[in-house]
């Protein structure tokens, strides 16, 4: 009986087999045919290949089928009525009915004047397909019921969703908005408020597991949520859930806590929509990545299947393109665009095509809707600052908050993406400023300086911001143990983001103090140690266990940690070794790597260096080494680099500061050999660099061996690259190493060939900046959360964090603030040229007001009303009153009984057909 479908179930991808080897059971086939809404199945004979057959056959006995076949779908029957219909005595029948209810084939209520218990044979969806999947043991014993549920939310609908009118025609579930989002809407109807339904069923609530979350996980496509208690049965359904061991009673206050936690996580409230406007039996809190009900609108691109009466609208004048609404919108209806006009006027953004007046079929569907709905911005681009930042921090947002004096809110917004704003406010390489549109006018906004001002709160324990834990679970902290190897920016970032998801990770750090290269690779005159300590203390407040002086691979192995119960590992040990030049004489005393020098001085600032120092290298680390050498007492420092002056990798600001302190720079040369006397270096012989890259664009310097100069010196610091020192860490592991001995990992998930090992930071990418490591740490945390939760996909519905910069050459800026860029002063009490103390002060509050006013406000969110389902999740994430719900579609609140669905569908279908024909004639 199975008919071809445009989206067949790929059984090869299921972690179980659907059994078909048992003898054919005619009663099961008849029962499936009686219950199903699938028209082809109603007209023919079910086979073993039909999901209605194998779904029921897995758990329904022939004795149960005999009873069910005496019933009619959704027609309540009392025990005496069933005794009469089946001929079975009550003493034998009642336990059987109870067992049928426990497995989920029957439900019951007391909706009659005498409040007599009635048994009901429900439809499949919403009904028995869900009930089958509300028992973990039943799923474990009969996993095929999960695929049955999935098929029953697809096959009966694939040919009719385009014909479903606003309101949903009594099919399935329906979105009900976040109550706070419509409180001020005086035209709202009672049935549009969750409070209406809670009042209607006052005191009759039960929380049960989410059948979608459990079934999808069993199919290998879990979302990482704990499934328990997200679904709330109301009225008689609450009693049914409790009496059949599918749920437990909850109070009104507990219901409100569940709803609030759902909103915190960005879940969508839905109510059942098969009984008209006077009855529901459940309120669900749905994750679009697994929800079979939301799938009916998202996969088929037919929003009428889900949408409420409300549509979100953005107030561009308030919007700052922070992207929070975009990240949480379940329908992908909100994307980042631009607020600034082009030279040709405002951009017109495309809208999703709707099935109202066009033929609709698989070519119009979005099979990959879970990924497609996570697209962040339109192709025309958005704010360059957010795009350029590796962590994609909401720069425009926190600048606006700072302008409004909302400094704590600004800090909280930054920490959505970066747990170390005080650190980054001092040492970030500021790609946001390089991209800033204001830089095309005069100078970029001093974004980092404003961030530093905001983050000063973190340096005072009384005022620091510790984020709330937002966990997709109602059962308390996650029990899974996670080990993070390496306490640098990537590892600590991963720990932070795991902690705010409800984990208690353990960080293993081989050094005496955590911080990695932040502590041991960046001099204190740029980043004071107390700044690092203050922000790391916040991780401890979140429950992160940081164990220093432990070298994994030496003091304890990964295998031993597994035996201790650790379920996943994030390796982020950085590039802690320095590369040598590979030229004669480099073993002489007095020659060391920059990594070694900076680590040594980072732990002991009393180190002394005498005589002249030559630093080989042209990057920021070489600059740091030169400046440290001067502070350690060197008589003079010369930097030597291969690159010409205008191609030096170090930032212009760093170069200027080094030269101001007395460092000399020689460009276009590399080391040929080191000269020594009595084993100690006395000079470096340099040779002229004639080219840096080969024909393929790879770094492959060439030299003129005859064009040489000699620089006398007493110390040489090599800053020509860093390397990874794995030690015995990976012994016995399947992790593969690639170029530069970096760990090979998936570009999106950071998972290695050893499934429970993830990597991040420099061990994966090679030496980069702190903000790159911080961004990688968050992605590692996302992957690890998904990995340790049962049967969860690492990729489905994952935000790829792809952003596009708007076209800065095609803007009509109009009026803007003309103030010049602000700069922080230096502390006159500190010798900025020779002290190890940081002499840089922060901007004053007045300067912050001036600087934030310089922001041009490039970006804004844009809502596609054709995709919006009116859930209101976006409004809960916006802190700028920039997005609100409006009751634009009151017809979407029309609730009808399932039995009357064709009374709603047929008139709409006829009107739609006329529109389609008329549209064809117009063409």
Task: List the predicted regions and their residue ranges.
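Ferredoxin-like iron-sulfur electron-transfer modules
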Residues: 58, 88, 119, 270-283, ...
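A short, conserved structural fragment
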Residues: 101-112, 334-335, 883
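Short, amphipathic alpha-helical interaction segments positioned at domain boundaries
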Residues: 115-154
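Flanking helices and flexible, charged tails adjoining ferredoxin-like Fe-S electron-transfer domains
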Residues: 331-384, 399, 445-447, 451-481, ...
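Beta1-alpha1 glycine-rich phosphate/pyrophosphate-binding loop at the start
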Residues: 393-396, 402-403, 444-448, 484-552, ...
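Glycine-rich dinucleotide-binding loop and its adjacent helix/turn
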Residues: 454-475, 534-554, 578-632, 737-753
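FAD-site-proximal beta/loop scaffold in flavoenzymes
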Residues: 587-610, 694-767
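A conserved FAD-binding loop/helix module that cradles the flavin
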Residues: 763-788
